[in-house]
Amino acid sequence: MICYNQQSSQPPTTKTCSEGQCYKKTWSDHRGTISERGCACPNVKPGVKISCCSSDKCNG
C-alpha cells in the first residue's frame, strides 16, 4: 500500500506501508490548521481529527 506522508506545508511525498491503512489528521494551533499524513491509523488526542482509509494514496 502507498500512503502520502507529508506535513501540510510540504510537497507531496509517498511511502510504501505494510500496515494496510493510511491516515490524515488535522488540528489547529497558532499557525492555523495543520495536517499530517502517514501509515497506519494511530490514536489521536482530543481536538485532533483523523480519517483513516485503506487504498493507495487515499489520504491525499
UniProtKB/Swiss-Prot annotation:
Tissues in which the protein is found: Expressed by the venom gland.
Coiled-coil region(s): none
Domain of life: Eukaryota
Main location per the UniProt record: secreted
Disulfide feature: C3-C22, C17-C39, C41-C52, C53-C58
Subcellular location: Secreted
Key words, A-Z: Acetylcholine receptor inhibiting toxin, Disulfide bond, Ion channel impairing toxin, Neurotoxin, Postsynaptic neurotoxin, Secreted, Toxin
One GO cellular component term noted in the UniProt record for this chain: extracellular region
Protein's name according to its UniProt entry: Short neurotoxin D1
Organism: Micrurus pyrrhocryptus (Coral snake)
